[in-house]
Structures are given as C-alpha cells and as structure tokens.
C-alpha cells in the first residue's frame, strides 16, 4: 500500500457520498472525517489527502527507520502530518477552520480520562474520545464518517453525514458516533480490527473484558 505510487492505485477505488465533504479555499469551515478501525483506514487517508488539503495527527514510532517508512507512506498522497500534542490539535483546528480537512480515528482509546467520556459501544460502556466533538464545537466544521471497505476488486469508500448527531451535547454526540460505527460494522464484521482493545478503558468497577 505505502510502496505503490498513489496514481497506480486510484482505479481500485469507488466512492459513495463524496458530495458530503465540503471544503472552502476561500476560508470558512472545512470537514472532520471520522475513520474507524474498519476495512482499510490507511486507504481512506490516502484518498482524502489526494483530493483535499488534509492535516492529520501522527504519533512518531520509536524506531527511526520504521518511522520514516510509515511517515513517508502516509504523506505520499499529500497529507500534512502534525504531532499528537496540544500544538498538533491547534494545527488541525486551524486547518478545518480555514476550509481544510482532518481525519480522526474515533474509536481510538483516549490517552487519559479527561479526554474521553464513557458511552456505549455495542452495549458496553467504554472511553470514547471527545476530540471530534470539541473540534466541531470550536470550528463549526462538518462531521463525516468515512469507511474504506475491502472488495474483491479493491476498496469501496463510503461517507456518511454525522452533522445532526454532532449538534447534540457531548455524551449524545459520542453515543451517536459509536452507533454509526456499529451500523458500519454490521454486515462487515470480518473487516473490523477486533484485536484493538477498544474496551480496555472502562468505568471504575466494570468488567475487564481483557483480564
């Protein structure tokens, strides 16, 4: 995926709902695309970078050679990567405020309790990052769910509008995001990254599903 030139892969991709992504070269809110661990999220990021001004968070890998390889692969279609830090969040906020696009993994376990809320995911309460809600609240950017499902001939990219969900309070908004992810998984269960310990951070006293 990261070794092949992006133009040589473009014919493998079909897109549904591209019209939902709104950007503005003249300023004004852009778009926040939420990409869960379903299908091939790296393909989704490459597509967004090739079509729009994409700015995304990136956490460096300890081993420099591997870090160079991953970073080069993720940037090859034009993405600008910023650090997972307060400065990085400021950068993506600035990008979407000025008409750009950012991509976020909404089902990634938050770094600490203050950056997440416990809301249901398939009926089990678990920590869910508040970053998408906070970015939307501070930028008025449109929020879209994007998945890149594997097919026999390549990838089917599907976009879904979540703006109505995001207009609610944080708990309702995050619950709505999780429901949208659940609905995307149903029927595509084999393509979700169940190995990722999504439920490892739960309310005190609740069952440890990985214990």
List each language-model region with its residue ranges:
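Membrane-anchoring hydrophobic helices of lipid-metabolizing enzymes
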Residues: 1-32, 67-71, 76-79
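Short, flexible loop segments at the rims of nucleotide/cofactor-binding pockets, characterized by
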Residues: 7-13, 59, 78-84, 121-123, ...
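A conditional alpha-helix N-cap/helix-loop micro-motif detector
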Residues: 11-15, 38, 63, 82-86, ...
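Non-catalytic C-terminal accessory region of glycerolipid acyltransferases
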Residues: 22-27, 50-51, 87-211
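Short beta-strand->loop
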Residues: 32-36, 55-61, 129, 146
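Solvent-exposed coil/turn segments that connect beta secondary-structure elements
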Residues: 38, 61, 107-109
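Membrane-embedded segments
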Residues: 40-43, 47-50, 54-59, 64
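Short, conserved active-site entrance elements at the starts or edges of catalytic domains
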Residues: 55-91, 95, 113-116
């Amino acid at each position: 995926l990261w070794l092949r030139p992006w133009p040589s892969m473009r014919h493998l991709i079909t897109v549904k709902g591209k019209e939902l992504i709104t950007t503005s070269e003249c300023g004004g809110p852009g778009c926040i695309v939420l990409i869960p661990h379903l299908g091939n999220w790296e393909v989704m990021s490459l597509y967004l970078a090739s079509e729009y001004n994409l700015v995304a968070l990136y956490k460096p890998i300890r081993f420099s050679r591997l870090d160079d390889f991953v970073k080069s692969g993720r940037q090859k279609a034009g993405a600008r990567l910023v650090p997972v830090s307060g400065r990085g969040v400021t950068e993506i906020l600035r990008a979407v405020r000025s008409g750009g696009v950012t991509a976020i993994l909404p089902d990634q376990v938050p770094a600490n309790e203050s950056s997440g809320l416990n809301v249901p995911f398939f009926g089990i309460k678990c920590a869910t990052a508040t970053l998408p809600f906070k970015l939307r609240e501070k930028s008025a950017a449109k929020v879209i769910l994007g998945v890149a499902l594997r097919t026999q001939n390549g990838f089917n990219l599907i976009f879904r509008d979540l703006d109505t969900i995001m207009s609610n309070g944080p708990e309702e908004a995050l619950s709505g995001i999780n429901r949208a992810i659940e609905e995307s998984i149903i029927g595509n269960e084999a393509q979700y990254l169940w190995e990722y310990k999504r439920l490892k951070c739960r309310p005190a006293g609740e069952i440890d599903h990985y214990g």
